Structures are given as C-alpha cells and as structure tokens.
Amino acid sequence: MEDFIFIKGTLSDGFKLEYEVSLFNLNEHRLLQSNGEWISYHIIKEKKKVALAGIHFHLSNGIASSPYRSPFGSIDASPDLEPSALFRFLQFIESDLLKSGVKSIIIKNPPTLFSPELQTLLQVFLSNLNYQIITAEPGAIFIVDKSGEDLSANWEKRKIKQAHDIDLELRHEEMNKLKAVYDFIHNCRFQKGYPSSITFDDLQRTVSAFPGRFLLSGVYQQGAMVAASICVRCNQQVLYHFYSDHNTS
C-alpha cells in the first residue's frame, strides 16, 4: 500500500530530504528572485518524516512560474521516486493551482543531462498532460570524467598545444575580482551587440548569499585578460557555465 502523500506548503520541522535541492530552488535563492508570493508542493512519507520530491512556484497576476527569475526550476526528486507517483504529483499540482485561480502554469526544466531519468519522465508526463513547449534553448554539456592532463583525443591535444603556442594562461580568480571579471565579460558582449543576462547588482547579491558556489576564471595572454567566465555550482554534480565571453582580438 502506498504510504506517500502530496502536500501543499512548506515542510514541517524534522523532515529529511531524500533528494538534493538545486541552487535555484533553495529558499534563499528564491527570495533573491522575488520576495513576493511563493507556493510549494512536496511528496512526503509522513510516518518516516522524509520528502521524496518538491517544486516551488512564484505567483503573480494569475501566472504560476517555476522558477521566476532563474535559468531553471521545476521538480527536484529522489531517484527512487516511482514514475506513477511523479505523474500523479503533477496532476495534483495542476489541480490545486487551477482551483487557486491560476490561469497559466510555466515550468522551466533544466537540461536533460542534469538528471536524465527525471527530466525524461517530466518531458513525457508534461506532454501527456497537454503542456506545450513555448521555448526550447540549445546548450552544451561536457561530461567531466578525466583530468585536464589526461587527454586522449587528438583534437584535445591539438587545442592544448595551440593554447600553449600563443602563450594562453588559464587562471582561477579570487572573488575579490568579481567586478573586474564581470566588467570584462559585459564589455565584450556589448561590443558584439549581445545583451547581458544578469546585472552586476543581481550577480553580487547572489554571490554574497552563496559565496562557495561560484567559480571565476580568466584566460590571459602576455598578462592581459582575453577571455573570462563565471560559473556556479547548481548541485553536487553540475557546474553551470552561465556568463562568459572573449575579446574580438
């Protein structure tokens, strides 16, 4: 007999999560996105005091969004969650939101390879529930299964040799260089006519809240920065390379 239930609202004290909450779904990060109205849903086993899944929506003008102002939100779930429970959880969420007066539900899933089994199920189940894809974004994912020095492919070796030949040097920057790294990337994008995806004030607030999750990198040639990137650790397995560029020279 099933012993899990679906609930609306925050978890009571004493509950243990059987899944990792991604950065953008953490309460602290959601409040950075907006301190307005949020609503949460969970799958729990009440007797065991454990939660198997969770999702959070920002409510505004009849629209429920997960996330509100972040690259992605959607459901975090235990790898042991039964597919049938996940499907019924989506039905429960939709029914409750519609009863609450919500007219539109927007869920932005992370890239499939972030959690392949969960994301594949979500894509199928949301389609079965007549959700439509309104935006599909391309991306690139690199599986890190070896060190930078353990290169087997010839093209990898060629790229490293080319970088050495033109005296490129990769440096990990300290967080006190955040403004300099941001300004470099921002200026590169401005010169190319690209928009900036984040303001420095928003970035600084997020870094201040989660300082241990960010990684700054710069590429130098003859002492001058020629490329830079800002990455953030979304969870224990994923480093998200979200803001980067290089100069045109």
Name these PLM-found stretches:
Residues E2-I63, N109-T248:
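A conserved beta-strand-loop-helix scaffold within acyl/acetyltransferase catalytic domains
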Residues H58-D76:
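A short glycine/small-residue-enriched secondary-structure motif
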Residues P71-E82, Y243-S249:
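A short, internal acetyl-CoA/4′-phosphopantetheine-binding micro-motif in the GNAT/acyltransferase core
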Residues P71-F72, V102-I105, A136-P138:
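Glycine-rich, often proline-containing surface loops adjacent to acidic residues and nearby aromatics
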Residues E82-R88:
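Short, conserved charged micro-motifs
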Residues R88-K103:
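Conserved acyl-CoA
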Residues S100-T112:
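Conserved GNAT acetyl-CoA-binding A-motif
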